[in-house]
Amino acid sequence: MARRKNVSGIARDALAFILEASRSTHPHEFAGLLRSDGRLISEVVLVPGTTSDEGSARMLLDMMPLDMSIVGSVHSHPVRDLRFSEADIDMFGAKGYYNIIVAYPYTDKDWVCYSPDGEKVSLPVVEADQ
């Protein structure tokens, strides 16, 4: 299982990027990896070769960077459903502790973070310079 990293929140700019990328790829899913600056989730890493459609997004494991600052994953659901699927929960542990799902219509209220076990994780949105 993925170990929990000491992350105190997600940078507002990183969340804004996630929401905009999800809108831009709609009705297909968006997927990426979450990178921490040691304090906050501050960036989204786009994995080469990622493909998606209306029902799923697939990241190629052999294209994922060897990067110790990766703390989780993000993907969108093009419907109004923030619940994870069995496929989502299977992927969560492989990508890190923090696993964000965003759902249509992709506003700042349409996201949730889960642990690899499927438990909701509190992840405050903060300004990166705080």
Segments predicted by a language model, with ranges:
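Conserved, mostly hydrophobic/aromatic
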Residues: 73
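Conserved beta-strand-loop surface patch within small alpha/beta domains used
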Residues: 1-70, 79-130
